[in-house]
């Protein structure tokens, strides 16, 4: 029955897409300019990138949304050979456009352009230009601006040298208030360690638990560490196993897509959970001692994040965990 249900769902979706394309074709025939972009966007959403690229190229001089999508597609190599310089060129067109119709796209374009400058991809690397563009995109915490830019400013100010932790806390607070899951977990850690704000364990746990419930794997990994250090071993074992058993190949990209969290932090959360689960198994804390299985989880932690595993191992040697 499940197979037939799958077929039914598949064909009903295919029929809906076909019907939508027919309607858009009719709207185009009647001279509806917006229908060209909508057809390209439908191709894009369905993963028909070559058709989407062709459609957007056709209307790029008249439609700012098409220009923006072309920037994304050339930068990421969707439907074409990756061409970061061309992607950057299209994003700059949106950011620099004086046309009111481009205004709603400028925050997202500035965020993407900031990433390009920060990574030095398609343009000469410049942290100053990246910061300038992100500040524009963040628009003083405006919820209708780029919340991603607000969050990445929090990350930027907490990792640059010298660190500017009060600015980092401010931007993570703005992003969290606008619903950003990555920043909610980051706020929890800043409260926990008193970074950029007075230490507040209660506020930290509130942020971390809520972020963990919403799917932030890095927050989950840090809660595992907290449960271990507080000697809540039964809770630590159950929680850490669930996270450690994520599949590193398939689950990390999927979780990143669903939660909009950065893969590097998902990886770090999984590595933390794997290490502490291994430690509990090795010592028989909250679970029957099993050194063979412990080795498997230690290996997974090392595979996921060698630097973090080495850091945690040094704490074991110093009898800190």
Annotate each PLM feature.
Residues 46, 81, 124, 160-162, ...:
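Structural motif corresponding to the intra-repeat A-B loop/turn of tetratricopeptide repeats
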Residues 41-43, 67, 72-76, 94, ...:
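Hydrophobic face of amphipathic alpha-helices that form TPR/SEL1-like repeat modules
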Residues 30-33, 61-67, 76-78, 97-99, ...:
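Short helix-capping/linker turns of helical repeat alpha-solenoids
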Residues 92-94, 132, 137-138, 231-249, ...:
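TPR/TPR-like (Sel1-like) alpha-helical repeat modules
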Residues 104-112, 145-153, 225-228, 253-273, ...:
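TPR/TPR-like alpha-solenoid helical repeat scaffolds
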């Amino acid at each position: 029955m499940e197979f037939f249900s799958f077929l039914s769902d598949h064909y009903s979706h295919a029929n809906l897409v076909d019907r939508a394309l027919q309607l858009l074709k009719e709207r185009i025939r009647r001279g509806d300019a917006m229908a060209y972009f909508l057809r390209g966007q439908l191709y894009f959403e369905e993963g028909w990138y070559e058709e989407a690229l062709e459609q957007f190229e056709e209307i790029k001089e008249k439609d700012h949304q098409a220009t923006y999508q072309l920037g994304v597609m050339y930068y990421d190599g969707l439907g074409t050979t990756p061409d970061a310089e061309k992607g950057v060129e299209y994003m700059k067109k949106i950011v620099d456009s004086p046309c009111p119709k481009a205004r709603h796209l400028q925050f997202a374009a500035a965020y993407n352009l900031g990433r390009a400058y920060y990574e030095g991809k398609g343009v000469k690397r410049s942290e100053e230009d990246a910061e300038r563009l992100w500040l524009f995109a963040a628009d003083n915490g405006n919820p209708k601006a780029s919340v991603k830019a607000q969050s990445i400013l929090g990350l930027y100010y907490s990792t640059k040298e010298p660190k500017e932790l009060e600015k980092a806390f401010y931007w993570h607070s703005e992003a969290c208030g606008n619903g950003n899951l990555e920043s909610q977990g980051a706020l929890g850690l800043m409260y926990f360690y008193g970074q950029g704000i007075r230490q507040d364990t209660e506020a930290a746990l509130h942020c971390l638990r809520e972020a963990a419930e919403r799917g932030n794997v890095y927050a989950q990994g840090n809660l595992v560490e907290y449960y271990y250090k507080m000697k809540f071993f039964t809770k630590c074992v159950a929680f850490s196993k669930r996270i450690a058993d994520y599949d590193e190949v398939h689950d990390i990209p999927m979780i990143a897509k669903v939660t909009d969290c950065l893969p590097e932090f998902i990886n770090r959360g999984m590595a933390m959970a794997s290490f502490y689960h291994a430690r509990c198994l090795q010592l028989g804390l909250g679970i029957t001692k099993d050194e063979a299985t412990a080795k498997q989880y230690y290996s997974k932690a090392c595979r996921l994040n060698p630097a973090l595993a080495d850091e945690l191992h040094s704490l074991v040697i110093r009898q800190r965990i």
